[in-house]
UniProtKB/Swiss-Prot annotation:
Pfam family, one: DUF1516
Organism: Bacillus pumilus (strain SAFR-032)
Name under which the protein is recorded: UPF0344 protein BPUM_1008
Protein's UniProt keywords contain Zinc-finger: no
Listed transmembrane segments: 5-25, 33-53, 60-80, 93-113
Length: 122
């Protein structure tokens, strides 16, 4: 159940991130609301990730470092998401942080799929 909640929160977070990205920069009440929902999803993503690690990740020998690395990468992804939205809202260049978000998101997702708790695609 925890894995599904975590992945659902990530999928919703990424979808709403792109909605907020499209709305950012406009003085629109909807843009602020979507951005706040994305921030709430950040907290849910972090909470479910920590819960997954505490409940099962700590008990799997040989993967502790990879789980810690995935948590750090996940927090970096969230940081890049937030920096992208804030920079876009302020009218600054978002190319670098958007590329960073995409790279870190891909690496984090691939690492998550490789680890034993996630879905086993590899």
């Amino acid at each position: 159940m925890g894995t599904h909640l975590h992945i659902t929160a990530w999928v919703l977070g990424i979808i709403l991130f792109f909605v907020a990205f499209a709305l950012a920069g406009k003085n629109d009440k909807g843009a602020k609301i979507v951005h706040m929902i994305v921030r709430l999803l950040y907290l849910i993503i972090i909470a479910t990730g920590v819960e997954l690690y505490v409940r099962t990740g700590m008990k799997i020998p040989g993967f502790g470092g990879e789980y810690i690395g995935k948590m750090i990468l996940g927090i970096l992804v969230i940081g890049f998401m937030e920096m992208t939205l804030v920079r876009k809202k302020k009218g600054k260049s978002v190319t670098g942080v958007l590329i960073g978000f995409i790279i870190f998101a891909i690496v984090t997702i691939l690492l998550g799929l490789r680890l034993p708790i996630g879905f086993h695609i590899f």
